[in-house]
Amino acid sequence: MLQGKNAMKPIAADRRTLASLTNSKLNKSQQEAAKIILENTDRVMGLQGYAGTGKTYMLQEVEKIAHYKGYNLTGLAPTGKAVRALKDANIKARTLASFLMQYDGVAAGRGTDKGRFDMKQEYKRRLLVVDESSMIATRDMQKFLTIADQLNIRVL
């Protein structure tokens, strides 16, 4: 994970774009979290908060700004229920298991240079949002982070 430190360009760092957060319905804590996500240059970020504090709601605002800047958010979650919650918030989502199955060859070190290049291009301007990460088995999280590292994927 250290090699992912300062490895990415920020999604949005200009004052004008970030000022739109103050005009949103987000509270101050949500605005600050959104600003950190949008300005961050690390490949892997963490977001922690109690249930019902508006993390997913805040991500809707992040998604709007990211989309405006040419980025997409994709949610990954360990359960179908968590995937549905992300989709209900208008965040494209799928199960982590389906993602791991699709990119199993990357985690195992198989594949061609062209295939890896194509996959990197697919995720070049995308933020993967992992919801309910505390429910993910350690082995699956390790596999996921290996894939994210190999494909240079930005993760929250």
Where are these regions (language model features)?
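Conserved ATP-binding/catalytic motifs of P-loop helicase motor domains
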Residues: M1-L156
